[in-house]
Amino acid sequence: MLTYAPLNFIAIGIGATLGAWLRWVLGLRLNGAGWPWGTLTANLVGGYLIGVMVALIASHPEWPAWIRLAAVTGFLGGLTTFSTFSAETVDMLERGVYATAAAYAGASLAGSLAMTGLGLATVRLLLR
C-alpha cells in the first residue's frame, strides 16, 4: 500500500527533477524548427523505459514502493511529456503544416506504444 511517507515524496521529487532535466537537455540539443526531435526522443525513450519498469516491478514484488515512485512517477513522469507533444502538434496545425503534424502525432503515439511493448518484451526475454 502506498502512503504519504516522506521517503515517497523525496523519491518522486528526485526522480522528477532528473527526468525533467534530461527532457530539457534533449529539447535543447535535438529540437529543430521543423520537427521537435527532442520531445519525440524523450517520449520514445520514456515509452521503452516504462515497459522495462512495468516488467521489472511485476517480477520483483518485494521492491519497496519508493523505487517504483522514483523511477516511474518521478523520473519517467518528468521525462515524458504529453502536454509539450500536444502543444507542438497544435503549433504545426496552426502553421498549416498538416502533413508534418499528422506524421509527428502518429510517430509519437504509435512509437511510444511500440517502445513500451518492446521494453516489456526485452525484460521478459532477459528474465527467461
From Swiss-Prot:
Domain statement: Shows a double-barrelled channel architecture in which two fluoride ion pathways span the membrane, and the dual-topology arrangement includes a centrally coordinated Na(+) cation.
Binding site for fluoride 1: 43, 112
Binding site for fluoride 2: 43, 104, 108
Annotated protein name in UniProt: Fluoride-specific ion channel FluC
Superkingdom of source: Bacteria
UniProt organism field: Bordetella pertussis (strain Tohama I / ATCC BAA-589 / NCTC 13251)
Note: Renamed the Fluc family to avoid confusion with the CLC-type F(-)/H(+) antiporters.
Family of the protein in this entry: Belongs to the fluoride channel Fluc/FEX (TC 1.A.43) family.
